Amino acid sequence: QPSDERWMIDGIGTDSPKLVKSAGRNGSASKLESWAEAINRVTAASLLDETRQKVRDTFAAFLGPALESRIPFAATYGNHDFQCGILADEQDDLYREFAGCMNPVADSSPLALEPGTFALPIEASDGSGRITMSVMMVNSGDYADTADAGDGNGRQSVTEYAKYAANSRGWDLADSDGYGTPSPEAVEWLKRVQRELGRRNGDGQAVPAIAFQHIPPQEFYDCLREVPAYTPNAVEGAREFAGHCYVLDRDVCRPGSRLGEAIGCADVNVGEVDALREAGGYFALFCGHDHKNSFVGHVHDIDLGYAPTCGFECYGPKSRFRGIRLFEFREDNPMAYVTRMLTWGDLVGRYSSNELRVFFEDHCVTDLIGVRNELRRPQVSATLLGAGAVTCGAIGYAVRGLLRKSQ
């Protein structure tokens, strides 16, 4: 039987069509395929251009207050950023279109490793040029998938890009091997950059530094205390920590700390906190990711802390607990920093304009762990018990009425 690759029908529509051997690709088919490919390229390019503009508009919206006040800003990346179809390296370029962006070009200096991983040294106010402290931004990755890792410079591999582009909005925790981690290069860079800052100061000493990233490392669980499953307000751990229930360890956490959900860390520990301790100088690591958490604990000789969600377009705590975290540093002793939450409740009021939505966001559950966590909340359990009692009473009353009628 002839192969479709080498044979074609000649004379279609005539009295004597025949099968002939093709010397190459069918000219009409090739033209049709070329036309289709060109259309696809144009469509994909236009869609990406539209997406880029949407990303620009989004950046402009949340950067608005900083831009209007001419306040410099820097950004790193979380596990959902890529799901718009524009990856971190290109988002970095888009950020730099805005005045005041301090994100450096990846690999442009020893202080800039990759998109979202870089150092921002702060010099003394006396004009000496001495670095008094540094802010470190760390790209903590998105989802674990070692087979499709990037090239270590923040430039995603072709395979990874294809997977993201094919179904970027669908790629999530359920499709991966857990949450991501900083790259091995980033963990090593956290040590190396301290040596570079010490070299620039001329004394070789690590400078006081605070790090910011999205996904927390496993050591954040060390700020918690394991308790029995029936403990009120306890939360069950996630993934590798599932089956264990926790509350805040008040002995290590600052006053005002809140634990609203499980710590969503990676399944593996890549030694980031150990690297911070080994490098010296690092006094704090703050993360986001878990929308309901806003605690600060001191373990492993370093502060580990959270800021919760500040908006109302996703799940989170009650309106009054949503907000941003403010930091204040003293030049003479940056390690003695002050941090506090600026919440919606403090700045605006107890309630938002859509409390029904906030209620569902606060109580949304997606699995059995979420159900169990909700049942540990005293208000929820009391409401369910009350509703159950009323229901049982109503059923009992109805049954009693039926029995009376039957007598």
Which residue ranges define each predicted feature?
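Binuclear metal-dependent phosphoesterase catalytic core
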Residues: A119-G127, S257-A279, H291-P378
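Active-site environment of divalent metal-dependent phosphoester hydrolases
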Residues: P2-E5, A44-S46, A75-L87, Y143-T146, ...
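Cytoplasmic C-terminal tails of single-pass
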Residues: S406-Q407
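Hydrophobic alpha-helical topogenic segments used for membrane insertion/localization
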Residues: Q379-L403
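Extended active-site neighborhood of metal-dependent phosphoesterases/phosphodiesterases
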Residues: I9-V42, L48-D203
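Short aromatic-enriched loop/helix-cap "lid" or pocket-rim segments at secondary-structure transitions
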Residues: G85-E90, D148-G150, Y221-E226, K318, ...
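His/acidic metal-ligating clusters that form di-metal
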Residues: S134-M136, D151-G288
